[in-house]
């Protein structure tokens, strides 16, 4: 049995890796995609079985449902994640410009306020 870590030491956790290379805990969107894909495979496979009573074909439909739902969720989530990162970067750059130019003769707000008062 391993000794508990001391209060000052960080606790080491093993991360869950899927297929040996996809770190589910640290990769954005991976966990949700896998969970929704699993649910999609169960629904697709079981639904197909209820309609047709063909076991092998239902398993194939379940695997196909897993692949489609997982990839669909993955691409949707990664697209939104990338879009959010771009918006954050643009906002960060604008804040830096605002801080840099505030109160100087290069401040765009100062030019607008100065020209409207004349």
From Swiss-Prot:
Main localization, broad class: mitochondrion
Instruction: Give the location in the cell.
Output: Mitochondrion inner membrane
Q: Which GO terms describe its cellular component?
A: mitochondrial inner membrane; mitochondrion
Q: Which residues cross the membrane?
A: 34-51, 61-77
Biological role stated in the UniProt entry: Essential for the assembly of the mitochondrial respiratory chain complex IV (CIV), also known as cytochrome c oxidase. Acts as a chaperone in the early steps of cytochrome c oxidase subunit II (MT-CO2/COX2) maturation, stabilizing the newly synthesized protein and presenting it to metallochaperones SCO1/2 which in turn facilitates the incorporation of the mature MT-CO2/COX2 into the assembling CIV holoenzyme.
Q: Name one Pfam family in it.
A: Cox20
Query: What name does UniProt use for this protein?
Result: Cytochrome c oxidase assembly protein COX20, mitochondrial
């Amino acid at each position: 049995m391993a000794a508990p870590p001391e209060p000052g030491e960080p606790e080491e956790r093993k991360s869950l890796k899927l297929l040996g290379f996809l770190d589910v805990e640290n990769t954005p969107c991976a966990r949700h995609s896998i969970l929704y894909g699993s649910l999609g495979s169960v629904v697709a496979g079981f639904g197909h079985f209820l309609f047709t009573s063909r076991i092998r074909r239902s398993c194939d439909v379940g695997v196909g449902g897993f692949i489609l739902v997982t990839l669909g969720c993955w691409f949707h989530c990664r697209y939104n994640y990338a879009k959010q990162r771009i918006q954050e970067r643009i906002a960060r750059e604008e804040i830096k410009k605002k801080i840099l130019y505030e109160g100087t003769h290069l401040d765009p707000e100062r030019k607008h306020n100065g020209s409207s008062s004349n």
